[in-house]
């Protein structure tokens, strides 16, 4: 099902949670609403669900104005971060709940529950209670319950936020496979850039109630339209506006940002480079993170493979030279403000 958010705004008292957002979601897409706490992503999800009503603008579902429709009329499945399963009901009864409310024939309910238990890889668990399941299993039951009524849209509000890191990583790979099987238009809220990059077809980056950028994971990561987007999606370094490195920047009105993996090191001078000193080396499995200090005292982070670090024989206090690849250039005043927002 297609979704059109047409200039929607929502205020809570004096606080503007969503500010004049226009967003179009294609049928069958898996979309991540990504941003920091308080950016409006969960409010936008609740507006789509019908749990909140907009102060202005319209919400269109499959070409029909659904702005004032109730949740029950929109045929939307909603999964919360904390599962919200009925503790006194078995797994099968939890999944069947929505179908029973709709007075679906018992034979159909039984067949649908068995089908969904297979789909979410919980066949044989129908007779268990939520307390007998792990967190990851409970979240899969919640997803099965949402899918039971064959919703036109599936909405997930930070569905893996309450789980530990390993389970979260396993479940998001499973969610991607599940989506590829059922092809339901799905929107999920997350503050985790890695989760958004790994799972989604489209990422919507939000900040202060507004949409900063919409695009595929590759587009968002490789071609950020603002310093906020670039810094929220991973570590960045702010580089000095050096005429030797960036001769095209004639005025000191630009901010030059670069990711740690787009910097390379050498122990000998040669070509355009920044002189620096190794302050600390952090060994992170196959990767080494080198914390440097430039001549002007500015910190810099460089990510290297173990092989590269071993070949350079890096050590603390060693002088090195930093070459820059793929820098991104933004207006300085806006970039300073956005970097502070992304770090907040």
Curated annotation (Swiss-Prot):
Pfam families: ABC_tran, TOBE_2
GO molecular function terms listed in the Swiss-Prot or TrEMBL record: ABC-type sulfate transporter activity; ABC-type thiosulfate transporter activity; ATP binding; ATP hydrolysis activity
Gene3D superfamilies assigned: 2.40.50.100, P-loop containing nucleotide triphosphate hydrolases
Binding site for ATP: 35-42
Annotated membrane topology: Peripheral membrane protein
Annotated ranges, domain ABC transporter: 3-233
Enzyme Commission number, as recorded: 7.3.2.3
GO CC, alphabetical: ATP-binding cassette (ABC) transporter complex
Biological process, per Gene Ontology: sulfate transmembrane transport
Places the protein is found: Cell inner membrane
CDD domains, per the entry: ABC_CysA_sulfate_importer
Quaternary context: The complex is composed of two ATP-binding proteins (CysA), two transmembrane proteins (CysT and CysW) and a solute-binding protein (CysP).
Entry's family note: Belongs to the ABC transporter superfamily. Sulfate/tungstate importer (TC 3.A.1.6) family.
Record-given protein name: Sulfate/thiosulfate import ATP-binding protein CysA
Natural source organism: Gloeobacter violaceus (strain ATCC 29082 / PCC 7421)
